[in-house]
């Protein structure tokens, strides 16, 4: 089968250190953390009191008040990012082409905020007082459906839920659908709004969150000897993918090209990654083969700041690239914004596209005392200008759901 080329023509992002692509990108290049004491609710009863919480985000800048009230916060991020990406792409819709435009998103948790509110309300007020829009508001597919309804997109519409790999998975599947000719355009990415009391209690019980409450901006420290867990974040990353000739014909801005995608399962444990990194290595090898490459110029790592993940990913990178691994810059976006679960891989895809555009690698911050077992070039502390043609982005979700994406300079 003839595989069509797929390019990125629009971006949108909301993250703890910036809403809007240029604001977010500037913060990343400056190594600016968005992690702070949580105030979405009172965290005093929890051992963890910090998060990558987005502040100053106004949903009414992107949707009507009626819509904003009817949807959960994770959908707010999706609608906002969709508007940003579509504005940048200058996509013109007609009744003839809407059936060739898809919406494929990722979310690991869906409408958790509204779900928690309604569970509490139901037990307080009784089961006959349940909000009538509870089901569509909580459902993970609400984000894709709300975007399709708003813009009239009538192609494939779905949400993929593979925990921390959800956003990357969605981008990969959107890439495939365009590549194989099922659609011409797809709005894709990942969104998450996990900052709820239940989620905090659950993740605290798992003992995977950093307890560095006294120094929030230093809490997320991938590959550092003193890392003690990840910091939960929220947000969304959105990309408009388009078949290359379709984009060229309408004079769209071509920001990068998606050239490789692979996914697999580690079949090892619901939370712990395969410690030798074999399955993470296997998915990277498959993505490289899909792109027809043997190496890349930069790796945006999954790099959650947990002992197990950072070590396994380092081993996997070395297994794939051998001695060359020590010459490939690797950095962690999560060091600045925390781990936004299903949105993480999509936000990092935005970072990869911006890195290719500006030929610069954002840093890993808080890498003060490198772990001897994590001995690659993690671009510590300061952004680094670099010649970038191909970049790799890794996303590894709970349940050993592994995804690798490759983005290349637009040609």
Regions of interest found by a model, annotated:
Residues 5-9, 36-37, 214-298:
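Condensing-enzyme catalytic core mediating Claisen C-C bond formation in acyl metabolism
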Residues 8, 23-25, 29-162, 191-200, ...:
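Conserved beta-ketoacyl condensing-enzyme motif
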Residues 22-29, 113-127, 177-180, 200-213, ...:
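A glycine- and small-aliphatic-rich helix-loop capping segment at beta-alpha/alpha-beta transitions
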Residues 124-131, 172, 176, 180, ...:
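Glycine-/small-residue-rich "gating" segment that lines the acyl/pantetheine channel
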Residues 182-228, 261-275, 301-310, 327-377:
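Acyl-CoA/ACP chain-elongation machinery
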């Amino acid at each position: 089968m003839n595989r069509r080329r797929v390019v990125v023509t629009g971006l949108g992002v909301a993250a703890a250190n910036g809403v809007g692509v240029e604001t977010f990108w500037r913060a990343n290049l400056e190594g600016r953390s968005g992690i702070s004491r949580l105030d979405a609710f009172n965290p005093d009863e929890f051992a963890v009191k910090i998060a990558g919480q987005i502040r100053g985000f106004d949903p009414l800048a992107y949707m009507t008040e009626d819509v904003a009230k009817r949807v959960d916060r994770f959908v707010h991020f999706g609608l906002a990012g969709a508007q940003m990406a579509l504005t940048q792409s200058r996509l013109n819709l007609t009744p003839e082409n809407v059936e060739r435009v898809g919406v494929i998103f990722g979310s690991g948790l869906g409408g958790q905020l509204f779900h928690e509110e309604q569970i509490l309300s139901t037990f307080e007020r009784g089961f006959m007082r349940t909000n009538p829009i509870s089901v569509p508001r909580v459902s993970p597919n609400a984000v894709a459906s709300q975007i399709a309804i708003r813009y009239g997109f009538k192609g494939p519409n779905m949400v993929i839920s593979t925990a921390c790999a959800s956003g990357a998975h969605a981008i990969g599947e959107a890439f495939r659908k365009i590549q194989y000719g099922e659609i011409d355009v797809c709005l894709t990415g990942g969104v998450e709004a996990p900052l709820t009391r239940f989620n905090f209690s659950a993740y605290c019980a798992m003992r995977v969150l950093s307890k560095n409450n006294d120094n929030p901006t230093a809490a997320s420290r991938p590959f550092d000897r003193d890392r003690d867990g990840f910091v939960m974040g929220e947000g969304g990353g959105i990309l408009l993918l388009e078949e290359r000739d379709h984009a060229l014909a309408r004079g769209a801005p071509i920001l990068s090209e998606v050239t490789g995608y692979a996914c697999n399962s580690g079949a090892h444990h619901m939370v712990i990654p395969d410690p030798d990194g074999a399955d993470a290595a296997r998915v990277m090898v498959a993505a490289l083969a899909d792109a027809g490459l043997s190496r890349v110029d930069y790796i945006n790592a999954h790099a959650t700041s947990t002992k197990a993940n950072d070590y396994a990913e380092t081993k996997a990178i070395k297994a794939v690239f051998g001695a060359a691994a020590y010459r490939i810059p690797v950095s962690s976006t999560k060091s600045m914004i925390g781990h936004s679960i299903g949105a993480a891989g999509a936000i990092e895809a935005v970072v990869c596209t911006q890195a290719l555009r500006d030929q610069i690698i954002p840093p890993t911050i808080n890498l003060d005392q490198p772990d001897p077992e994590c001995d690659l070039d993690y671009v510590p502390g300061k952004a680094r200008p670099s010649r970038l043609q191909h970049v790799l982005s890794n996303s590894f979700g709970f349940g050993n759901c592994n995804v690798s994406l490759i983005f290349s300079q637009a040609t």
